[in-house]
From Swiss-Prot:
Domain of life: Eukaryota
Family the entry assigns: Belongs to the universal ribosomal protein uS14 family.
Protein name: Small ribosomal subunit protein uS14c
Gene that encodes it: rps14
Subcellular location, record wording: Plastid, Chloroplast
Originating species: Cucumis sativus
Subunit structure as annotated in this protein's UniProt entry: Part of the 30S ribosomal subunit.
Length: 100
């Protein structure tokens, strides 16, 4: 189980990313439309003004049961070992065990 503070920090980052998403997107569109390099640098400076944690690259997927940050399966939102336990217990419909 991940520490609760790390899970809360990740939730805070998600809220910030949603809050500043449109601002970042509009600034990036402006950069692509402006022909002169000096104006691009000015817009790039504005792009750096939102908080760092509002950048989408700082988000990290976590298992929604345990909060584990590694080995997550996007389709299920679970980490690998929790996914395996749930499949063995037949708690995930449509998921089958395989061996090769």
């Amino acid at each position: 189980m991940a520490r609760k503070s790390l899970i809360q920090r990740e939730k805070k980052r998600q809220k910030l990313e949603q809050k500043y998403h449109l601002i970042r997107q509009s600034l990036k569109n402006e950069i692509s439309k402006v022909p002169s390099l000096s104006e691009k640098w000015e817009i790039h400076g504005k792009l750096q003004s939102p908080p760092r944690n509002s950048a989408p690259t700082r988000l990290h997927r976590r298992c929604f049961l345990t909060g584990r940050p590694r080995a997550n399966y996007r389709d299920f939102g679970l980490s690998g070992h929790i996914l395996r336990e749930m499949v063995h217990a037949c708690l995930l419909p449509g998921a089958t065990r395989s061996s090769w």
